[in-house]
A protein has these predicted regions:
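Sequence/structural signature of outer-membrane beta-barrel proteins
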Residues: 41-45, 65-67, 83-89, 106-108, ...
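Outer-membrane beta-barrel "beta-signal"
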Residues: 54-58, 181-193
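Residue-level signature of outer-membrane beta-barrel architecture
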Residues: 60-64, 86, 101-103, 107, ...
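Cleavable N-terminal export/targeting peptides
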Residues: 1-29
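Membrane-embedded beta-strand positions of outer-membrane beta-barrel proteins
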Residues: 34-38, 58, 80-84, 118-122, ...
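Solvent-exposed loop/turn segments connecting transmembrane beta-strands
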Residues: 44-52, 84-95, 112, 174-182
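Outer-membrane beta-barrel translocator/channel fold
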Residues: 118-150, 154
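Repeated loop/turn-to-beta-strand initiation elements of outer-membrane beta-barrel proteins
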Residues: 34, 65-70, 107-109, 116, ...
Length: 193
Protein backbone atom coordinates (compact mmCIF):
# COMPACT_ATOMS: atom_id res chain seq x y z
CA UNK A 1 0.00 0.00 0.00
CA UNK A 2 2.88 2.38 0.75
CA UNK A 3 4.27 1.67 -2.71
CA UNK A 4 0.88 2.59 -4.23
CA UNK A 5 0.81 5.86 -2.27
CA UNK A 6 4.37 6.69 -3.39
CA UNK A 7 3.42 5.90 -6.99
CA UNK A 8 0.38 8.18 -6.72
CA UNK A 9 2.60 10.95 -5.31
CA UNK A 10 5.11 10.48 -8.15
CA UNK A 11 2.30 10.64 -10.73
CA UNK A 12 0.98 13.83 -9.10
CA UNK A 13 4.43 15.43 -9.23
CA UNK A 14 4.81 14.43 -12.89
CA UNK A 15 1.33 15.79 -13.66
CA UNK A 16 2.23 19.06 -11.92
CA UNK A 17 5.42 19.38 -13.94
CA UNK A 18 3.55 18.71 -17.17
CA UNK A 19 0.76 21.12 -16.29
CA UNK A 20 3.23 23.84 -15.33
CA UNK A 21 5.17 23.53 -18.59
CA UNK A 22 1.91 23.57 -20.57
CA UNK A 23 0.60 26.56 -18.62
CA UNK A 24 3.88 28.39 -19.07
CA UNK A 25 3.79 27.81 -22.83
CA UNK A 26 0.14 28.88 -23.07
CA UNK A 27 -1.01 31.65 -20.79
CA UNK A 28 -4.63 30.57 -21.33
CA UNK A 29 -4.01 27.02 -20.03
CA UNK A 30 -6.00 25.37 -17.25
CA UNK A 31 -3.42 26.11 -14.53
CA UNK A 32 -3.80 29.52 -12.89
CA UNK A 33 -1.12 29.40 -10.19
CA UNK A 34 1.74 27.31 -8.84
CA UNK A 35 2.68 27.45 -5.15
CA UNK A 36 5.90 25.96 -3.76
CA UNK A 37 6.85 25.84 -0.12
CA UNK A 38 8.86 24.47 2.78
CA UNK A 39 6.78 23.18 5.70
CA UNK A 40 7.49 22.09 9.27
CA UNK A 41 6.20 18.50 9.49
CA UNK A 42 4.27 17.43 12.59
CA UNK A 43 3.54 20.85 14.09
CA UNK A 44 2.06 20.73 17.59
CA UNK A 45 1.20 23.58 19.89
CA UNK A 46 0.87 22.05 23.37
CA UNK A 47 2.24 18.52 23.11
CA UNK A 48 5.26 16.50 21.96
CA UNK A 49 5.45 15.99 18.19
CA UNK A 50 5.57 12.35 17.14
CA UNK A 51 6.58 12.93 13.50
CA UNK A 52 9.03 15.75 12.79
CA UNK A 53 11.01 17.02 9.85
CA UNK A 54 10.74 19.17 6.75
CA UNK A 55 8.20 18.77 3.93
CA UNK A 56 8.54 20.12 0.40
CA UNK A 57 5.14 21.27 -0.87
CA UNK A 58 3.90 21.94 -4.38
CA UNK A 59 0.37 22.88 -5.35
CA UNK A 60 -1.39 23.68 -8.61
CA UNK A 61 -4.41 25.96 -8.51
CA UNK A 62 -6.61 25.80 -11.59
CA UNK A 63 -8.66 28.62 -13.09
CA UNK A 64 -11.68 29.72 -11.06
CA UNK A 65 -14.95 27.83 -11.37
CA UNK A 66 -17.11 30.95 -11.84
CA UNK A 67 -16.93 34.73 -11.65
CA UNK A 68 -15.56 36.17 -8.38
CA UNK A 69 -18.02 36.98 -5.63
CA UNK A 70 -17.88 40.49 -4.20
CA UNK A 71 -18.68 40.46 -0.48
CA UNK A 72 -18.18 43.67 1.51
CA UNK A 73 -15.63 44.84 -1.05
CA UNK A 74 -13.62 41.60 -0.86
CA UNK A 75 -13.17 39.41 -3.93
CA UNK A 76 -13.82 35.69 -3.30
CA UNK A 77 -12.95 33.01 -5.86
CA UNK A 78 -13.18 29.21 -5.81
CA UNK A 79 -10.47 27.19 -7.58
CA UNK A 80 -9.81 23.44 -7.82
CA UNK A 81 -6.40 22.44 -6.48
CA UNK A 82 -3.99 19.51 -6.70
CA UNK A 83 -0.88 19.17 -4.56
CA UNK A 84 1.77 17.09 -2.83
CA UNK A 85 3.79 17.41 0.37
CA UNK A 86 6.84 15.17 0.44
CA UNK A 87 8.40 14.39 3.84
CA UNK A 88 12.16 14.67 3.35
CA UNK A 89 12.90 12.33 6.27
CA UNK A 90 10.77 9.39 5.09
CA UNK A 91 7.74 9.93 7.33
CA UNK A 92 4.23 10.67 6.01
CA UNK A 93 4.01 12.17 2.51
CA UNK A 94 0.67 13.15 0.99
CA UNK A 95 -1.05 13.82 -2.32
CA UNK A 96 -4.23 15.90 -2.22
CA UNK A 97 -6.90 17.51 -4.34
CA UNK A 98 -10.00 19.54 -3.68
CA UNK A 99 -11.29 23.08 -3.60
CA UNK A 100 -9.62 26.32 -2.57
CA UNK A 101 -11.48 29.47 -1.53
CA UNK A 102 -9.38 32.60 -2.05
CA UNK A 103 -10.34 35.92 -0.46
CA UNK A 104 -8.57 39.09 -1.56
CA UNK A 105 -8.98 41.23 1.56
CA UNK A 106 -7.59 44.49 0.21
CA UNK A 107 -5.92 45.54 -3.04
CA UNK A 108 -3.44 48.26 -4.04
CA UNK A 109 -2.09 48.77 -0.53
CA UNK A 110 1.44 49.92 -1.32
CA UNK A 111 1.27 49.96 -5.14
CA UNK A 112 -0.94 48.87 -8.02
CA UNK A 113 -1.46 45.11 -8.16
CA UNK A 114 -0.49 44.22 -4.59
CA UNK A 115 -2.76 43.18 -1.73
CA UNK A 116 -3.39 40.92 1.25
CA UNK A 117 -5.30 37.64 1.00
CA UNK A 118 -6.70 34.72 2.98
CA UNK A 119 -7.07 31.26 1.47
CA UNK A 120 -8.78 28.16 2.76
CA UNK A 121 -8.90 24.67 1.26
CA UNK A 122 -10.86 21.47 1.75
CA UNK A 123 -9.29 18.40 0.12
CA UNK A 124 -9.16 14.62 -0.03
CA UNK A 125 -5.76 13.11 0.80
CA UNK A 126 -3.93 9.89 -0.04
CA UNK A 127 -0.83 9.26 2.09
CA UNK A 128 1.97 6.75 2.62
CA UNK A 129 1.99 7.03 6.42
CA UNK A 130 1.28 4.46 9.10
CA UNK A 131 -2.32 3.37 9.76
CA UNK A 132 -2.34 1.31 12.99
CA UNK A 133 0.11 -0.18 15.51
CA UNK A 134 2.78 2.32 14.51
CA UNK A 135 6.35 2.73 15.76
CA UNK A 136 6.83 5.44 18.39
CA UNK A 137 8.14 7.93 15.79
CA UNK A 138 5.11 7.64 13.47
CA UNK A 139 1.50 8.90 13.66
CA UNK A 140 -1.33 6.33 13.47
CA UNK A 141 -3.65 7.87 10.89
CA UNK A 142 -6.24 5.05 10.77
CA UNK A 143 -7.16 5.30 7.09
CA UNK A 144 -5.35 5.61 3.77
CA UNK A 145 -7.89 8.22 2.58
CA UNK A 146 -8.09 11.34 4.76
CA UNK A 147 -9.46 14.87 4.70
CA UNK A 148 -7.37 18.03 4.66
CA UNK A 149 -8.16 21.55 5.84
CA UNK A 150 -5.72 24.34 5.11
CA UNK A 151 -5.51 28.03 5.90
CA UNK A 152 -3.17 30.60 4.43
CA UNK A 153 -2.53 34.31 4.88
CA UNK A 154 -0.36 36.18 2.44
CA UNK A 155 0.78 39.19 0.52
CA UNK A 156 0.24 39.48 -3.25
CA UNK A 157 3.47 41.26 -4.22
CA UNK A 158 2.29 42.03 -7.75
CA UNK A 159 -0.19 40.41 -10.17
CA UNK A 160 2.10 37.36 -10.56
CA UNK A 161 4.05 36.78 -7.32
CA UNK A 162 2.88 36.14 -3.76
CA UNK A 163 4.33 35.01 -0.44
CA UNK A 164 2.28 33.38 2.32
CA UNK A 165 2.23 31.50 5.60
CA UNK A 166 0.22 28.27 5.53
CA UNK A 167 -0.98 25.68 8.04
CA UNK A 168 -2.86 22.48 7.29
CA UNK A 169 -4.29 19.49 9.14
CA UNK A 170 -4.97 16.02 7.78
CA UNK A 171 -7.09 13.47 9.59
CA UNK A 172 -9.93 10.99 9.21
CA UNK A 173 -12.29 13.15 11.30
CA UNK A 174 -13.50 10.25 13.41
CA UNK A 175 -14.42 8.00 10.47
CA UNK A 176 -11.73 5.47 11.43
CA UNK A 177 -9.60 4.62 14.45
CA UNK A 178 -7.07 5.68 15.44
CA UNK A 179 -7.38 9.33 14.43
CA UNK A 180 -4.08 10.97 15.39
CA UNK A 181 -4.10 13.59 12.61
CA UNK A 182 -1.07 15.50 11.38
CA UNK A 183 -0.34 19.22 10.98
CA UNK A 184 2.22 21.05 8.86
CA UNK A 185 2.99 24.77 8.69
CA UNK A 186 5.38 26.88 6.68
CA UNK A 187 6.08 29.44 3.99
CA UNK A 188 5.02 29.29 0.34
CA UNK A 189 5.80 31.32 -2.78
CA UNK A 190 3.12 31.61 -5.46
CA UNK A 191 3.40 32.37 -9.17
CA UNK A 192 0.33 33.16 -11.32
CA UNK A 193 0.58 32.39 -15.02
Amino acid sequence: VQQIARTVAAVLVAAMAGAVSTAYAQSDGIVDELKLGVLDHGVTFFEHSVETGVDLNGELLFHRLFEPLDVLGMSIIFRPNLGVSVATNGTTSIGYGGLSMDIMLVRNVFRDGDGFFLDGAFDLVVHDGCLNNCPSDRKALGSRLLGRRAGEIGYQIDPQWSVSAMIDHIGNYGLATPNAGLKTAGIRIGYKF
